[in-house]
Amino acid sequence: MSVNLLLGLQWGDEGKGKIVDVLTQSYDIIARFQGGPNAGHTLEFEGVKHVLHTIPSGIFHPKAINLIGNGVVIDPVIFKKELENLTPYNIDFTSKLLISKKAHLILPTHRLLDAASEASKGKAKIGSTLKGIGPTYMDKTGRNGMRVGDIFTKTWKKRYNTLVKKHLRMLEYHDSCLLYTSDAADDSPSV
């Protein structure tokens, strides 16, 4: 069995999804191994354009199994909308789409942290999509994020609430930094 890999080495939209869609029509498995719901990849199926943010590009291929690996961060709201947008095509997601239980979940507070972090950088901001992807990866590497498999445990609510409380403390810190920098700017002498 051979394995082929299409790996993008740029930031942002470089056309990976479109290329994967063209190249993978005869492949059995199409996998996403990292990333999150940024700009998305645009595909055309039955004359209709679709923008997929999380679901792999091979979802329209009749025999392909699509994998979302543990390196992917998933926003449940965006993911649900993607699934709903594809329901008219009668895709059997239970057999065509597999998701790692170790993939991390983007929470609403991750989005807030992303926005607060970006705002605190002022002119040095990086141009984040504000989707909460960076803060989710911070929780992943810090080993305290929520994973897909966590929602099937009895303690998921406690785990969720603990993480949200941590995020709220971080947001308070960002707010105080913004107040400090804006106060300092107000007090600086004009030239």
Model regions and ranges:
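N-terminal low-complexity segments that are often proline-rich with Ser/Thr-Pro
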Residues: 189-191
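Residue-level marker of positions within ordered structural domains that often coincide
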Residues: 84, 186-187
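N-terminal phosphate-binding or glycine-rich loops at protein starts, especially the Walker A/P-loop
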Residues: 4-35
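Short hydrophobic/aromatic residue motifs in ordered secondary structure
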Residues: 15-16, 137, 186
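Glycine-rich nucleotide/cofactor/substrate-binding loop typically near the N-terminus or early
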Residues: 34-178
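Conserved small/polar residues in nucleotide/adenosyl-binding loops
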Residues: 180-185
